[in-house]
């Protein structure tokens, strides 16, 4: 598991990002992302595998002081998380 945490000072109401499998993901590889607002789980993305098309994930983070993104990979899963946007 990998994670990144950011202080956002209660300035944002939502986050959006895109998820796709990386080109060298293994056949059985999967992954997903969990979004935490002040250490409370607010969104879990669908599981992404080798044949998954791009998906967009949106999470409500209204009133959060801290934002954490946690990446979970299994069996050679490799994901690209892109187009991350915070919305006021």
Give the ranges of each region predicted by the language model:
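Gly-Asp-aromatic-enriched flexible segments
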Residues: 1-88
């Amino acid at each position: 598991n990998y994670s990144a945490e950011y202080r956002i000072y209660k300035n944002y109401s939502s986050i959006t990002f895109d998820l796709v499998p990386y080109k060298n993901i293994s056949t059985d590889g999967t992954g997903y992302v969990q979004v935490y607002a002040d250490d409370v789980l607010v969104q879990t993305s669908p599981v992404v595998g080798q044949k998954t098309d791009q998906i967009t994930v949106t999470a409500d983070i209204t009133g959060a002081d801290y934002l954490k993104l946690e990446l979970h990979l299994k069996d050679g899963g490799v994901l690209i998380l892109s187009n991350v946007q915070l919305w006021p």
